[in-house]
């Protein structure tokens, strides 16, 4: 596979994204890009690799306001490179930049990674490991392209939900967060630890997946058993009540 900036599928999706004007369609394309990156790429350094467990995607362009995007020029025209969130503060976080031009912002916030057999749940844990591999204090100063193709794409399911902690009214309900279950089974101990740390519920993934998959009642029941280990009747009823009111 080619590097990300020469990946024909990725480039075609970004081109499609830039030309679309419908907000729902734009967010659908963003989710396609996000899922492609999380299943086909990793962060590779001379002395180690971070596989992508959990990502959120952010975009701002002429066709999409994307108010929750930082809007830093380092999030533009640096496809495959890293963007460090810190500007003298203590909050740790970094993006993988996907923008190939100076007139739009496109990047993925790295929420979780896997290093060898260690699951790095906390955003800061992934930051520290990435910083150690990159050998720089500020990840924006790491010059090589860090995003590199996997030898083989992952084949496990990818789950989705809303991005975490957003308050902007136009951004907060968009389903633009992905979790790669090739590295983390839904019923595993590690999966439950993820939720214990982050303080949100597995039902958020379940609700988003019902919406994205447009499930019927039986499919909703089966999906609930798969993701939650039980039938989440309240969420299923709420989903179909809302669907009925929109018909």
Which positions does each model-derived feature cover?
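A cross-family signal for N-terminal binding/gating loops and helix N-caps
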Residues: 1-247
């Amino acid at each position: 596979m080619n590097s990300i900036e020469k990946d024909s599928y990725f480039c075609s999706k970004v081109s499609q994204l830039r030309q679309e004007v419908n907000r729902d369609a734009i967010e659908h394309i963003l989710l396609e890009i996000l899922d492609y990156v999380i299943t086909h790429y990793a962060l590779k350094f001379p002395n180690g690799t971070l596989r992508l467990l959990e990502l959120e995607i952010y975009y701002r362009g002429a066709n999409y306001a994307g108010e929750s995007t930082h809007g830093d020029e380092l999030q533009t025209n640096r496809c495959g490179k890293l963007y460090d969130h810190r500007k003298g503060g203590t909050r740790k976080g970094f993006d993988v930049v996907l923008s190939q031009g100076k007139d739009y912002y496109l990047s993925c916030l790295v929420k979780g990674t896997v290093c060898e057999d260690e699951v790095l749940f906390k955003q800061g844990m992934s930051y520290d490991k990435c910083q150690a591999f990159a050998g720089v204090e500020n990840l924006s100063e790491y010059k090589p392209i860090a995003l590199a193709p996997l030898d083989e794409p992952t084949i496990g399911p990818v789950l989705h939900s809303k991005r975490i902690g957003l308050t902007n009214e136009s951004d907060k309900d968009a389903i633009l967060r992905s979790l790669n279950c090739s590295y983390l089974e839904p019923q595993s101990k590690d999966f439950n630890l993820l939720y214990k740390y982050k303080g949100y519920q597995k039902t958020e993934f379940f609700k988003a997946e019902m919406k994205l998959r447009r499930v019927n009642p039986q499919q909703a029941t089966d999906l609930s058993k798969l993701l939650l280990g039980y039938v989440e009747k309240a969420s299923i009823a709420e989903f179909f009540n809302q669907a009925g009111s929109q018909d």
